[in-house]
Structure formats: C-alpha cells, structure tokens
C-alpha cells in the first residue's frame, strides 16, 4: 500500500515538471517573435530578432545593415562607419552607403574622399580633372595650376674683370633675382635668375694690392733710364776680335788697290806739267 502511494507521487511530480517546461519554452518563443520585446538584445539594440539582429536602436545611435555572406544583419553604432553617411530622422537614425566611387561622404551628393583612381573636385569623384585644374596625386584632389613667380631684378653689380674693378677698360656686370613661387606640374617654368652684360669703365690706376697681373708684368718689362744707359754696350777698351784669313786677304787687296790708284794719279799730274 505504501509503495503504491509513493509511486503515484513520483508520477504526478514528473508530470507537473513536464508541463512547466513546456509552458516555459512556449513563453520564450513568444517573446522572441514579438517585435516590441527587447529582452536579450545586445549592442545598443532597442528591439531585435535572432535572425535579423537589431531591428531598432536606442536613442542617439545609428542603425546600419551589415552584409554577412547572403544575409544582412542590423547593427547599432555611435557613428557611421567609413563609406556611410548618417541621417537623423524623428523615429530612427540611419546610416546610408556612399556612392561606389566615394570612400567617405557627407551626404549622398557630397563626397569628402574618393576611392583609389579618382580625384575629388567640389564633392564629386572624377576620372580626370577639368580644364584649368591639375591632379594632385598626393591629396588625390583637383587643384589650381600654379605658375612660377620671380622677384624683381637686383641693381647691376659693379663692372669687373677677373674679380678686379680697376686696371681695365672693358668688363662684365651682372644682376640676379629670386624665385618666389615654384610652379606645379603643369605650371609655367621659371625664368633665368641671373643676367650678365659687357660694360666699360673709365681707366683708373689700381691701389696697391689690387693691380692686375698684366700691369705687374708691364712694370717689370719697362727698364729705368739709368738701367737703360748701363745696358748700352761700351766698345771702348775692348780687344779687337780675331780676323779670319779671308778677311785679312780682302784687306790686303783693298790696300793694293789704294796704292795703285795713288800711282796712277801721280803719273797723270807729271804729264800735264
């Protein structure tokens, strides 16, 4: 009798546990399927589902759909990720994807950074920059063409020749200018920064230490008057140079001719008397 009562007690207890577990699982399924229930939602979701993720977000958060394979999952973020722009509505804050050629954007019509191979100009991404602009490959933007700018010419330098300013008549003078703005890739090239031209000066003697090389050489070549007198050879007191046999024979013949001429003159005088 006691054994029969105990067995019935365990049967009834197991049946009650089974009914309770069924009611609990039914309640969990109902809560997951109900769209207004937020129990168990993670990451700032106000409402969610196991299959689609977040369905709505808490205040100030942005709702964005992320693609995972063939499936899109709702996510709530404090700011929109790169490639999306945020728009706030009364009932939801939403992230929308930028255009295909845009990396980051302010809204659907204004890009702030283009993807590789495109140049940014006035909020749009272009393959080539418009006329009058050039592409900056560093910033990937269309920028204005910059031409070279140079300063005014300096005054002409003193007339010089081989670094000297005296001791000559013709020399060279120069002037220079500086580059203020270097050109961009398509800008006009810079002009020459120096010029030189021939010049003439009034002849003037150089101070000591500035005389040119030619002037010093000329001074060395000009002898003094006393030195020139001393340089004249004095033949007095010099021994006569030795004569060659031919010179002696010529002198003897000249003497004979003179003697013969005198004899002829004397004979002619005697015949006249």
UniProtKB/Swiss-Prot annotation:
CDD domains: FU. Residues 147-207 form the TSP type-1 domain. PROSITE patterns: TSP1 (PS50092). The keyword Transcription does not apply. It is found in: Secreted. Disulfide bonds join 41-48, 45-54, 57-76, 80-95, 98-105, 102-111, 114-125, 129-142, 148-190, 159-166, 199-206. Residues 224-252 have a biased composition (Basic and acidic residues). The keyword Zinc does not apply. GO terms for cellular component: extracellular space. InterPro entries: Furin_repeat (IPR006212), Growth_fac_rcpt_cys_sf (IPR009030), R-spondin (IPR051514), Rspo_Fu-CRD_dom (IPR043601), TSP1_rpt (IPR000884), TSP1_rpt_sf (IPR036383), TSP1_spondin_dom (IPR044004). SUPFAM superfamilies: Growth factor receptor domain, TSP-1 type 1 repeat. One of its GO terms (biological process) is blood vessel remodeling. Residues 213-223 have a biased composition (Basic residues). Its main location: secreted. GO terms for molecular function: frizzled binding; heparin binding. Residues 1-21 form the signal peptide. FU repeats lie at residues 35-86, 92-135. Glycans are attached at residue 36. Keywords: Disulfide bond, Glycoprotein, Heparin-binding, Repeat, Secreted, Sensory transduction, Signal, Wnt signaling pathway. Residues 201-273 are annotated as: Disordered. It comes from the Eukaryota. Belongs to the R-spondin family. Interacts with the extracellular domain of FZD8 and LRP6. It however does not form a ternary complex with FZD8 and LRP6. Interacts with WNT1. Binds heparin. Interacts with LGR4, LGR5 and LGR6. The FU repeats are required for activation and stabilization of beta-catenin. Activator of the canonical Wnt signaling pathway by acting as a ligand for LGR4-6 receptors, which acts as a key regulator of angiogenesis. Upon binding to LGR4-6 (LGR4, LGR5 or LGR6), LGR4-6 associate with phosphorylated LRP6 and frizzled receptors that are activated by extracellular Wnt receptors, triggering the canonical Wnt signaling pathway to increase expression of target genes. Also regulates the canonical Wnt/beta-catenin-dependent pathway and non-canonical Wnt signaling by acting as an inhibitor of ZNRF3, an important regulator of the Wnt signaling pathway. This is R-spondin-3. It comes from Bos taurus (Bovine). The lineage of its organism: Eukaryota, Metazoa, Chordata, Craniata, Vertebrata. The gene is RSPO3.
